[in-house]
């Protein structure tokens, strides 16, 4: 070595300058607010987006987008849904599938119509015709679509944003008319009078999927007595046989039917009362000599409710009560008892059901059986009409209940009134109660194809499997689907009605003609053109006889036709789609409407697999609401809030990481604490990548590449572990188990890389000479790890993955990480014997590190290199692994001393004296001693043999050699 007086060595010379330190432009901080949009611009500029998947040569993979509603700001539910879809699409793209994701929007319906009306002055509303309303609704929908689209793009979602599908587009409307037409021609669509869910606040019929059931709904329930006017001879005879002391007319004169209802306003619509033929009923008398007919099992409960002592006089089966007559409570007519079904139970009420066929499905079905009138006593606003008699003009949601209750009390028919908490349907848009109301509507007859729909459900893979049972039970039990709506903003039902009479004009010729017109001109012509211009030529002469229908289609029929309007129409997609993916509420919504239309038209399901996710809740498991102040805004997660200390900008990748971290099959929490934890995980992955990139800055794979058997054992293990992790992550993606990806990624980056391989590698990387095998072999492994880590995380952490790829310091064939394709390693890289030995040695390393940490905590030592370790084995397995390592390991890399990052390690038969600490455990005795020798000022190892360095510094033999070789 040259003397320290040599002018080449200046006093300020630092050994730091002789180390191979980390060098990379990949920053420690993500700076996501700026960097992520830059990456997205890079993708756009280089067509690194959905077109990548479109240009792949593999099989078509179609994830068909369930259309979000084109109204309102994006929320965490959107984020969960769209990111899940994007993870799958990006993974499939990397796997070589032809992926063409077409995002869609649901554009018709009441919310948009109401928004348009709310934005107008009252004078403007009065003068607004249907065409202008539809024009304004179209404009409003496009504004909302553009706003939501920008949000989706910012999340890193890839899709055909230039040509999404919109239910308001001409091509879509035309295809939907085709679905309607085929269902009609197959005999599955009919028009009829039937009770439907009716929203007085919206003035339209609603489908089941448009309802919600608030937790805190109370109805005014009443118990009512109805005077019996006629009993059967059989019951009269039996009564007097069992009660001979009563006078001849006493029984009939004093007997009342007892009913219970939660809708007092329907009392004027009463046409019968229904009993269950299998239930036992009693005639029970009170102290005032009034006799009540009610279910036997409820007699005691009702006795307590009425505060009356009831004594049973006669017990009969429900089937014997048929045709008993009673006085209608509000009208001058007699009604009768009819036989109902299993919907009549003894769980509540009296076991006898007030029956108003115009205001309930069960009532309607019983009414058809007995040819009862389907009387509707309510108009479209919820006001009682002329059929209600003296109650006309009162409103079912306001004063009608009280008026009728007062009337019943005045007539001495009211037995009890009480508030009753139960599930009650509300209009999901206006948040106000709905009612059942019989109106002329268009229906899809599910009975006509129910068995085919149930078979189709069996043919689909449901993820999670519970989804199958859920939708199956819904389809088994559902009634006919009301598909007509009394609103302007929707697709018209293409039917013509005879001006004089009930005849309708709807056939294949009409349907095909309207479908063609809508395809060319759009659905607005239904309101703009005269009947003669809408009819086919051979009907024009009789156009004066017909008028256009005014009903529009249920929005669930709109979105439920998307398989026909999108998957069947676009050559880059396929039908049935490979996957539908939406929230669990869509079992009764889009999944079901799509299934029903597809089965009705083509006798097959529109999807092969259906995956459902839960809802996003706050950290305490509560539903998010503005009133609770617990709404988490995805935009604030990405860009930060007004106070960045409280609401920092995490970027889209942390949002995406959250999606991958949760068990999406159930409701999932999100909040500030969870985001902080995810940010820490994100940072660990990023720092791991940075360390890998920074240490291959001078590596060239074209010069320094190795076969696996040329590598040290530690490197062979690392590559084998990379293959295992790739297989595990691949399986997680394949099975849509993204939380497993999250767990595997964390463990790989923290446990396998940071805490083990990279921790050990520091000496190899920093201290070795630049081109030394022990360094280049490590760089070779690190290059493999960082390249493939970027690919493995890219479906989830797409921006970070691209950032990593752009900072790989040597040239790569692929411009983008997404052009790389999915890793395809040789399985020969996996070595079970190697894994077993390394696992044993890692366990020993953990125990030794605990002992060293004990010394550090006692402030006996600082760095682990200040120690040496003696190990007295108890465990033969561990001892054999140490022997194996010594026999087969590379002397420059695989010394267990270097794996421990201590200055010396020995397997001993007895322990030395002067221990810092001794740990006696299952695998043996671990003795920590002060390291012998002196500290090398360059590598910090303690060695017995020390050489003089620069300016009185000390160097070990290895470092002295490197300094002499490379710096003299």
Swiss-Prot record:
Provide the binding site for ATP: 626
Localization, per the record, is: Cytoplasm
Q: What Pfam family is a match for this entry? A: Anticodon_1
Keyword Zinc appears in the UniProt entry? yes
Instruction: Write down the required cofactor(s).
Output: Zn(2+)
What keywords does the record list, in alphabetical order?
Answer: Aminoacyl-tRNA synthetase, ATP-binding, Cytoplasm, Ligase, Metal-binding, Nucleotide-binding, Protein biosynthesis, Zinc
Record: residues binding L-isoleucyl-5'-AMP = 582
Q: What is its EC number?
A: 6.1.1.5
Q: Which InterPro entries match?
A: aa-tRNA-synth_I_CS, aa-tRNA-synth_Ia, Anticodon_Ile_BEm, Ile-tRNA-ligase, Ile-tRNA-ligase_type1, Ile-tRNA_ligase, M/V/L/I-tRNA-synth_anticd-bd, Rossmann-like_a/b/a_fold
Explain how, and how many, cofactor molecules are bound: Binds 1 zinc ion per subunit.
Q: Which PROSITE patterns match?
A: AA_TRNA_LIGASE_I
The free-text function statement in the UniProt record for this protein reads: Catalyzes the attachment of isoleucine to tRNA(Ile). As IleRS can inadvertently accommodate and process structurally similar amino acids such as valine, to avoid such errors it has two additional distinct tRNA(Ile)-dependent editing activities. One activity is designated as 'pretransfer' editing and involves the hydrolysis of activated Val-AMP. The other activity is designated 'posttransfer' editing and involves deacylation of mischarged Val-tRNA(Ile).
- What do we know about how this protein assembles, alone or with others? Monomer.
Q: Which PANTHER family match?
A: ISOLEUCINE--TRNA LIGASE, MITOCHONDRIAL (PTHR42765:SF1), SOLEUCYL-TRNA SYNTHETASE (PTHR42765)
Q: Which NCBIfam families match?
A: ileS
What protein name is recorded for this chain?
Isoleucine--tRNA ligase
Q: Which organism is it from?
A: Prochlorococcus marinus (strain MIT 9312)
């Amino acid at each position: 070595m040259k003397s320290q007086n040599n002018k080449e060595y200046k006093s300020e010379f630092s050994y730091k300058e002789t180390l191979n330190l980390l060098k990379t432009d990949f920053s420690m901080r993500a700076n996501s607010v700026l960097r992520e949009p830059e990456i997205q611009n890079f993708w756009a500029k280089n067509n690194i987006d959905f077109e990548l998947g479109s240009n792949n040569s593999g099989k078509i993979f179609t994830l068909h987008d369930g259309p979000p509603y084109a109204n309102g700001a994006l929320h965490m539910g959107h984020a969960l849904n769209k990111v899940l879809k994007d993870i799958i699409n990006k993974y499939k793209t990397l796997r070589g599938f032809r992926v063409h994701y077409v995002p869609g929007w649901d554009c018709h319906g009441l919310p948009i119509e109401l928004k348009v009306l709310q934005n107008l002055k009252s004078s403007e509303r009065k003068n607004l015709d249907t065409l202008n309303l539809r024009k304004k609704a179209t404009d409003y929908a496009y504004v909302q679509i553009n706003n939501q689209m920008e949000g989706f793009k910012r999340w890193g979602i890839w899709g055909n944003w230039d040509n999404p599908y919109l239910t308001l587009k001409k091509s879509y409307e035309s295809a939907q008319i085709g679905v309607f037409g085929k269902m009609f021609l197959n005999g599955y669509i009919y028009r009829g009078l039937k009770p439907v869910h009716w929203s007085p606040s919206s003035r339209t019929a609603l489908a089941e999927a448009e309802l919600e059931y608030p937790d805190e709904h109370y109805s005014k329930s009443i118990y009512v007595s109805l005077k019996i006017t006629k009993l059967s001879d059989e019951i009269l005879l039996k009564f007097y046989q069992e009660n001979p002391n009563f006078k001849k007319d006493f029984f009939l004169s004093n007997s009342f039917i007892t009913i219970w209802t939660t809708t007092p306003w329907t009392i004027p619509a009463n046409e019968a009362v229904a009993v269950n033929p299998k239930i036992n009923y009693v005639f029970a008398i009170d102290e005032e000599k009034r006799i009540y007919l009610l279910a036997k099992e409820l007699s005691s409960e009702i006795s307590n409710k009425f505060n009356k002592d009831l004594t049973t006089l006669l017990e009969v089966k429900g089937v014997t009560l048929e045709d008993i007559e009673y006085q209608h409570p509000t009208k001058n007519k007699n009604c009768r008892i009819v036989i109902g079904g299993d919907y009549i139970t003894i769980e509540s009420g009296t076991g006898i059901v007030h029956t108003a066929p115009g205001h309930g499905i069960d009532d309607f079905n019983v009414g058809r059986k007995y040819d009862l009138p389907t009387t509707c006593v309510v108009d479209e606003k919820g006001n009682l009409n002329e059929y209600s008699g003296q109650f006309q003009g009162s409103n079912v949601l306001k004063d009608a209940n009280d008026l009728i209750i007062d009337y019943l009390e005045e007539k001495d028919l009211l037995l009890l009134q009480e508030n009753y908490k139960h599930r009650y349907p509300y209009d999901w848009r206006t948040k106000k109660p709905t009612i059942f109301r019989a109106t002329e509507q268009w229906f899809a007859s599910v009975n006509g194809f129910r068995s085919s729909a149930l078979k189709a459900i069996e043919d689909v893979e449901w993820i999670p499997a519970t989804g199958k049972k859920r939708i199956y039970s819904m389809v088994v039990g559902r009634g006919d689907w009301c598909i007509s709506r009394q609103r302007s903003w929707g697709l018209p039902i293409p039917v013509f009605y005879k001006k004089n009479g009930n005849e309708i004009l709807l056939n294949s010729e009409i349907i095909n003609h309207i479908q063609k017109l809508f395809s060319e001109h759009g659905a607005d012509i239904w309101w703009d053109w005269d009947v003669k211009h809408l009819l086919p030529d051979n009907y024009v002469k009789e156009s004066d006889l017909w008028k256009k229908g005014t009903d529009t289609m249920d929005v669930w029929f709109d979105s439920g036709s998307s398989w026909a309007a999108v998957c069947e129409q676009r050559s880059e997609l396929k039908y049935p789609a490979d996957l539908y993916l939406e929230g669990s509420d869509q079992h009764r919504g889009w999944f079901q409407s799509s299934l029903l239309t597809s089965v009705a038209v083509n006798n097959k399901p529109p999807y092969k697999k259906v995956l459902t996710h839960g809802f996003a809740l706050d950290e305490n498991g509560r539903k998010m609401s503005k009133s609770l102040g617990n709404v988490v805004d995805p935009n604030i997660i990405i860009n930060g809030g007004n106070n960045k200390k409280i609401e920092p900008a995490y970027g889209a990748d942390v949002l995406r990481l959250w999606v991958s971290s949760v068990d999406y099959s159930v409701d999932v929490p999100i909040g500030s604490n969870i985001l902080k934890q995810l940010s820490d995980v994100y940072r660990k992955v990023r720092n791991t990548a940075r360390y890998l990139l920074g240490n291959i800055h001078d590596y060239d794979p074209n010069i320094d590449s190795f076969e696996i058997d040329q590598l040290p054992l530690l490197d062979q293990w690392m590559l084998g572990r990379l293959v295992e992790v790739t297989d595990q992550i691949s399986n997680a993606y394949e099975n849509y188990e993204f939380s497993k990806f999250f767990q595997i990624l964390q463990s790989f980056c923290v446990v396998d890389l940071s805490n083990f391989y990279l921790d050990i590698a520091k000496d190899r990387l920093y201290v070795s000479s630049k081109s030394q095998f022990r360094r280049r072999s490590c760089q070779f492994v690190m290059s493999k790890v960082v390249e493939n880590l970027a690919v493995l995380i890219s479906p989830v952490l797409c921006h970070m993955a691209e950032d990593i790829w752009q900072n790989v310091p040597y040239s790569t064939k692929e411009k983008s990480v997404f052009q790389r394709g999915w890793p395809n390693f040789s399985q020969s890289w996996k070595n079970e014997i190697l894994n077993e030995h390394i696992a044993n040695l890692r366990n020993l390393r953990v125990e030794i590190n605990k002992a060293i940490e004990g010394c550090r905590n006692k402030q006996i030592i600082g760095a682990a290199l200040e120690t040496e370790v003696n190990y007295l084995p108890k465990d033969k397995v561990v001892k054999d692994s140490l022997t194996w390592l010594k026999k087969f390991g590379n002397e420059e890399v695989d010394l267990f001393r270097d794996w421990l990052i201590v200055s010396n390690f020995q397997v001993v038969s007895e322990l030395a004296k002067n221990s810092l600490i001794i740990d006696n455990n299952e695998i043996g005795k671990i003795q920590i001693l002060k390291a012998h020798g002196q500290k090398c000022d360059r590598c910090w190892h303690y060695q017995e043999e020390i050489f003089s360095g620069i300016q009185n510094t000390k160097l070990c033999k290895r470092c002295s050699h490197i300094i002499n070789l490379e710096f003299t």
